[in-house]
């Protein structure tokens, strides 16, 4: 497969500030990824605050409480804005790489009692089908080598390091836990090794789209 290429960019005003949106595309498959860039990030010796955020239509756009994705997206952009410089790679691997319709099929199995890993396996997929190596290529195309990575996922860190990206710090991103996703977060911690911190008061649930507060389940 040919390497991904940087193909276009434009200004993108957001509630977190004026970002540049940079488009990337594989020349053979036309599969697309994007990055949101704030400030000067290219070819500097200073580590850049960055987030690899995998696409989640239900969490990012439809305000789902079944995961923490939408909360992580907003929190990452807010932290980058506060820092005044940084990058968010929007990694277009919906449903941990199984696609939107299969993710809904997995949700249906979860409604019947399976956890997020069991549901993927029952559908014939691995627990995580995502390819993070492309994100290392995107960092390189953006002129970024040293990264402070906003993540709870050790696999992202390992993949970036193996690809030659210097991860100088892991920045925790524990936000959005609620009664609908606490078991999901537990599963990611126990079965996937994610660094999950439950029910921290410094990370209160922010749910401006809910008609009432969604209480955090007590442990």
Curated annotation (Swiss-Prot):
Catalysed reactions, semicolon-separated: GTP + 4 H2O = 2,5-diamino-6-hydroxy-4-(5-phosphoribosylamino)-pyrimidine + formate + 2 phosphate + 3 H(+)
Biological process terms in GO annotation: riboflavin biosynthetic process
Obligatory cofactor(s): Zn(2+)
Name assigned to this protein: GTP cyclohydrolase-2
UniProt: GTP binding residues: 51-55, 72, 94-96, 116, 151, 156
Keywords: GTP-binding, Hydrolase, Metal-binding, Nucleotide-binding, Riboflavin biosynthesis, Zinc
Annotated metabolic or biological route of this protein: Cofactor biosynthesis; riboflavin biosynthesis; 5-amino-6-(D-ribitylamino)uracil from GTP: step 1/4
């Amino acid at each position: 497969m040919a390497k991904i290429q940087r193909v276009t960019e434009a200004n993108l005003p957001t509630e977190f500030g004026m970002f540049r949106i940079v488009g990337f595309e594989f020349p053979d498959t036309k599969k697309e990824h994007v990055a949101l860039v704030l400030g000067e990030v290219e070819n500097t010796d200073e580590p850049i605050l960055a987030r690899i955020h995998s696409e989640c239509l239900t969490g990012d756009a439809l305000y789902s409480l079944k995961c923490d994705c939408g909360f992580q997206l907003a929190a990452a952009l807010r932290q980058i804005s506060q820092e005044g410089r940084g990058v968010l790679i929007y990694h277009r691997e919906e449903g941990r790489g199984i696609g939107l319709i299969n993710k809904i099929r997995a949700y249906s199995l979860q409604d019947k009692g399976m956890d997020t890993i069991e549901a993927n396996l029952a559908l014939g997929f691995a627990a995580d089908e995502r390819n993070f190596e492309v994100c290392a290529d995107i960092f390189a195309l953006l002129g970024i080598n040293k990264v402070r990575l906003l993540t709870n996922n050790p696999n992202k860190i390992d993949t970036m390091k193996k690809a030659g990206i210097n991860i100088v710090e892991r920045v925790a991103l524990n936000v959005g836990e609620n009664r609908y996703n606490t078991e999901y977060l537990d599963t990611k911690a126990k079965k996937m090794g994610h660094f999950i911190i439950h029910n921290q008061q410094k990370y209160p649930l922010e749910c401006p789209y809910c008609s009432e507060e969604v209480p955090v389940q007590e442990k």
